[in-house]
Amino acid sequence: MWGLVRLLLAWLGGWGCMGRLAAPARAWAGSREHPGPALLRTRRSWVWNQFFVIEEYAGPEPVLIGKLHSDVDRGEGRTKYLLTGEGAGTVFVIDEATGNIHVTKSLDREEKAQYVLLAQAVDRASNRPLEPPSEFIIKVQDINDNPPIFPLGPYHATVPEMSNVGTSVIQVTAHDADDPSYGNSAKLVYTVLDGLPFFSVDPQTGVVRTAIPNMDRETQEEFLVVIQAKDMGGHMGGLSGSTTVTVTLSDVNDNPPKFPQSLYQFSVVETAGPGTLVGRLRAQDPDLGDNALMAYSILDGEGSEAFSISTDLQGRDGLLTVRKPLDFESQRSYSFRVEATNTLIDPAYLRRGPFKDVASVRVAVQDAPEPPAFTQAAYHLTVPENKAPGTLVGQISAADLDSPASPIRYSILPHSDPERCFSIQPEEGTIHTAAPLDREARAWHNLTVLATELGWSWGPERGWVPLLVAEWSAPAAPPQRSPVGSAVGIPQDSSAQASRVQVAIQTLDENDNAPQLAEPYDTFVCDSAAPGQLIQVIRALDRDEVGNSSHVSFQGPLGPDANFTVQDNRDGSASLLLPSRPAPPRHAPYLVPIELWDWGQPALSSTATVTVSVCRCQPDGSVASCWPEAHLSAAGLSTGALLAIITCVGALLALVVLFVALRRQKQEALMVLEEEDVRENIITYDDEGGGEEDTEAFDITALQNPDGAAPPAPGPPARRDVLPRARVSRQPRPPGPADVAQLLALRLREADEDPGVPPYDSVQVYGYEGRGSSCGSLSSLGSGSEAGGAPGPAEPLDDWGPLFRTLAELYGAKEPPAP
């Protein structure tokens, strides 16, 4: 069993055992010299558990760090020591005979702080273990070889300006890779190298704080602070590292707005409309963002009514605009004060206020050529209806504020009076009727009157220049700009020299319409009605205005023989009643005359008629039949019978018309009408002929009736040369001249059915074939001989085939019979 492990110390005790660890001895068998049962006793095993090696040590040869020895080793050289585990054989080696352990290279604790190995003693000859393996640790002892570092640096921090002393800015943290449990190699102390006196740092925690109060961002916005961390507790010989902290002062609203000048002067033309921008005002505020937002307002003075001020979208500028129309002649300048105020105020900095400023504003109104100004914004005139043309309606008036002596011309825009019902006097502005007015047709007329300034105009040089005035007429379109000194009908700048006004003319009502029935009345009464029964309520209307003689009175037939009576209800209606005795039976309806009149001065009246039929009624009061229908029934024909008779007659007529149309269509398909046979032919040739002989047309009637045809006239026979356009079927040659009519009728029907053949009544133009053709010319001009018109030979036509042989026999020259 192991007896004792001796630890050899090297120079000054730098190497050594950390301590002893006792363990119970194990039973071991007897030796070869003492056979027999083993004697059990308590033995000492390993008495160590760890070694230490200083890091970063590099010597000229492997360094001895310890010695292993077992009590079974008698010094006879039979014991061999083995070392296994982390770094065994490479970092750590052992002498097999002596048990000395050496380290072969420099170690770094930051890479590996300790090594775990196994030691074992075996028999050199048989490698039989003499002892079980035992584990031990070799620790690398730390030295101060790593400076502090800031893994998160450089740092950026923000702190509000004007912060109090000691306000925390940021915490910096350094890291030292040395062993914090051994010595002071990892004990750090923080200091400020650069950034004093504005900032300080806590030596132990690394918290950066403000060192002075009231740091102003507007003076210095950014600071660069250098922080150092030193190990060994900050003592001499320690290693150090540093980092930078960029501290930015954030803005707070600690500065009030300030106008750069105390007086602002602007000018605006008097014609500027509401909303026109006059100018911009800006109060300076060195703060940023929302802390520099401002609101502007007009404090006092005469400008609050004429002008308004608002803040632009960026919240910096004040926009001064026109609030109401300006008038140079009324007021030429305005003076008032404008205040600028911060919208967001921090109560913590109220002591640095007030956060507002005031400036004076003066606005000068510039004169400009103005259009004529009407005395009223709108005019309301009245005129009675039915007045003669030329009746005075009213007068409108406008004045030139720039030059009261300048004349004004008035006109009515045509689109506002399309019917030309009114006219206006150009110089005076009086409006007259141009046609009779009817209130019932149109009660209101809305005119647009144009007032134009003449005599002077605002020229391009912004000066007053004279204009030559020509005869005035209302323009239908906006006038064009005329050169200075030219004769014009309206001013040079119509937009600045003319103005418009609305004139509403009301047509007053007169009693010019007689009352009328509201609708045509056609009613009935039962023949069994009792006397005094109400037949119909009659209503009337008067187109005149309500209240102007529009009340209507009624009066019916008078006298004891009246079949009906009319009772006036005094509310614009009347009741049609039966008289005291029943109405006598009657086949025709009754026409009841009713007189209507109004209460005007003078009163107007009219007569209307109400149709009343006497009918037979059912017991429930419904109509069974009226006397006119009963009269028809007495003749033996009812309404249903009449309708049946009319239907039958119409059906018969339709059948007859259809039969005639079908028969006529069949006849037209079988025969050729005579008027269709009469055709004229216009034949045009390229060369001049011999006169009228060449233009004689053939008689189609003679061709259809060869037996009754007149003998041909002396001279060359006329020919109608038409090239066939459609290919026809071969037909057998007719047996004789008697069948010519049938042949021509067949050819005519084929030509009519062929869509490619032109109509007969057409102009045919033929070319000249020339002498190179074997058949010669097909033109009729060459049909006769030049000598005396003798007929030409028919042999060429015979050569063309059977279709042309028939023509050759008809029109070819025949040999006279032999004597």
Curated annotation (Swiss-Prot):
Locations listed in the record: Cell membrane
Extracellular-side positions: 45-641
Ranges for region Disordered: 768-800
Position of the signal peptide: 1-19
Domain notes: Three calcium ions are usually bound at the interface of each cadherin domain and rigidify the connections, imparting a strong curvature to the full-length ectodomain.
Assembly notes: Associates with alpha-, beta- and delta-catenins.
Function: Cadherins are calcium-dependent cell adhesion proteins. They preferentially interact with themselves in a homophilic manner in connecting cells; cadherins may thus contribute to the sorting of heterogeneous cell types. Cadherin-24 mediate strong cell-cell adhesion.
Protein name as annotated: Cadherin-24
Origin species: Homo sapiens
Lineage: Eukaryota, Metazoa, Chordata, Craniata, Vertebrata
